UniProtKB/Swiss-Prot annotation:
GO terms for molecular function: metal ion binding; single-stranded DNA 5'-3' DNA exonuclease activity. The chain crosses the membrane at residues 39-59. The lineage of its organism: Eukaryota, Metazoa, Chordata, Craniata, Vertebrata. Belongs to the phospholipase D family. Residues 194-221, 409-435 form the PLD phosphodiesterase domain. This is 5'-3' exonuclease PLD3. It comes from Rattus norvegicus (Rat). Glycans are attached at N97, N132, N234, N282, N385. Mg(2+) binds at F436. Residues 60-488 are lumenal. Phosphate binds at H199, K201, N216, H414. Residues 1-38 are cytoplasmic.
Length: 488
């Protein structure tokens, strides 16, 4: 039932007609209105500018991974990045007909140390830079000892030095001397965290330049072991992203630390396989990103190293050239034994399904795992005129005279890289399962078109080594290379 309401008419007062305003009041009113509009515009611009500034500060501090959708890409990097391949060529190893020559690792390291102004972060496996560390009296240790001396001089001149190192079982003298000089050192117990080691090898200088490659902090890595790496100069975008990987190690080096189930957002990255960084590299457009292993050490946005490696293999259409010390489709350190065919399957598929030319240059020395030979023979057996599969395998043997042969754990090709017609992959891991699932490692991936870039330089290094007298087919007589190789 609708209630009965009493309505009363609302009386609106009748306004008296307004008279015309004088001209001076009209002009004053217009001026005030114009001023108010300008004030409003300035306020709007101030609010927008403040919002943009706060957003930029937020991204700088916390990363902007979650602000980008799946089809959106981060802004390109405008740094004039310069990449230089660097190598350690063991004493006595010569390439007389080579047309390519790269700076030495020791030259690159000393140059980075001389140019450091504010900070140096080093991720490392172990430290043996002096003869005392290896109980030797080798003149060739001088380069490593000079590197250590220059490192000791950094903190006293105001450079902040941080070193993340795998919890050591070996010599500590170098690290103790660096601590005394003012460096900070944290030991990462990867055995406790993932049942592996910290196998990474990189430097970041002033968050602007960096080295990444196969060389350990070992005098032998400068003069008695064949190494390859890359130095990036004036590339702060990539250097800051590599620093995020270092910060993860630094975090895990704290007492009682554990791997977070979800990494805090400051460790996240926006650069990965799906959204690589757009850079100008040696004057040429390129796409680049950094990958990391094992997966638990990959915060938001970081591509795992194995996924990155397999993407290079899967996207190759012409050739895949690989140079690594160890190649095993197994969990190398697993008990009981476990087969691990992830990379092996990718290479076979590339050769058989797409007709990609595959070349593997594997190291052979006195410490090679004998079971590698069977797996390498299996790969090489795919080369067949009927299937048109083209896989070839060679063993690289670094020769040694009597004195060199006495140097422990030396005279080996320690490279860890891959190059295709499109992409450069430079890593720090050997190619067996445990290195990608348990051990900490890092890789740099660069895609670049044209000739003369980093990719073509690395291809030239591979072909130089492949065609050299130090590379041997699997059916080579063991007598022809002496007893330095366990796989012949």
């Amino acid at each position: 039932m609708k209630p009965k309401l009493m309505y009363q008419e609302l009386k609106v007062p009748v306004e008296e007609p307004a008279g015309e305003l004088p001209m001076n009041e009209i002009e004053a009113w217009k001026a005030a209105e114009k001023k108010a509009r300008w004030v409003l515009l300035v306020l709007i611009l101030a609010v927008v500018g403040f919002g943009a500034l706060m957003t930029q500060l937020f991204l700088w501090e916390y990363g902007d991974l979650h602000l980008f959708g799946p089809n959106q890409h981060p802004a390109p990097c405008y740094d004039p990045c310069e990449a230089v391949l660097v190598e350690s060529i063991p004493e006595g190893l010569e390439f007389p007909n080579a047309t390519t020559s790269n700076p030495s690792t020791s030259q690159a390291w000393l140059g980075l140390l001389a140019g450091a102004h504010s900070s140096l972060d080093i991720a490392s496996f172990y430290w043996t830079l002096t003869n005392n560390d290896t109980h030797t009296q080798e003149p060739s240790a001088q380069q490593g000892e000079e590197v250590l001396q220059q490192l000791q001089a950094l903190a006293p001149r105001g450079v902040k030095v941080r070193i993340a190192v795998s919890k050591p079982n070996g010599p500590l003298a170098d690290l103790q001397s660096l601590l005394q000089s003012g460096a900070q050192v944290r030991m990462v117990d990867m055995q406790k965290l993932t049942h592996g080691v910290l196998h990474t090898k990189f430097w970041v200088v002033d968050q602007t330049h960096f080295y990444l490659g196969s060389a350990n902090m070992d005098w032998r890595s400068l003069t008695q072991v064949k190494e390859l790496g890359v130095v990036m100069y004036n590339c702060s975008c990539l250097a800051r992203d590599l620093t995020k990987i270092f910060e993860a190690y630094w975090f895990l080096g704290q007492a009682g630390s554990s791997i977070p189930s979800t990494w805090p957002r400051p460790f996240d990255t926006r650069y990965n396989q799906e959204t690589p960084m757009e850079i100008c590299l040696n004057g040429t457009p390129a796409l680049a990103y950094l990958a990391s292993a094992p997966p638990p050490l990959c915060p938001g946005g970081r591509t795992p190293d194995l996924k990155a490696l397999l993407s290079v293999v899967d996207n190759a259409r012409s050739f895949i050239y690989i140079a690594v010390m160890n190649y095993l489709p197994t969990m190398e350190f697993s008990h009981p034994r476990r087969f691990w065919p992830a990379i092996d399957d990718g290479l076979r598929r590339a050769a058989y399904e797409r007709g990609v030319k595959v070349r593997l240059l594997i190291s052979c020395w006195g410490h090679s795992e004998p079971s590698m030979r069977s797996f390498l023979l299996s790969l090489a057996a795919l080369r067949d005129n009927h299937t048109h599969s083209d896989i070839q395998v060679k063993l690289f043997v670094v020769p040694a005279d009597e004195a060199q042969a006495r140097i422990p754990y030396a005279r080996v090709n320690h490279n860890k890289y891959m190059v295709t017609e499109r992409t450069t992959y430079i890593g720090t891991s050997n190619w067996s399962g445990s290195y990608f699932t348990e051990t900490a490692g890092t890789s740099l991936l660069v895609t670049q078109n044209g000739h003369g870039g980093l990719r073509s330089q690395l291809e030239a290094v591979f072909l130089r080594d492949w065609e050299s007298p130090y590379s041997h087919n699997l059916d080579t007589s063991a007598d022809s290379v002496g007893n330095a190789c366990r796989l012949l």
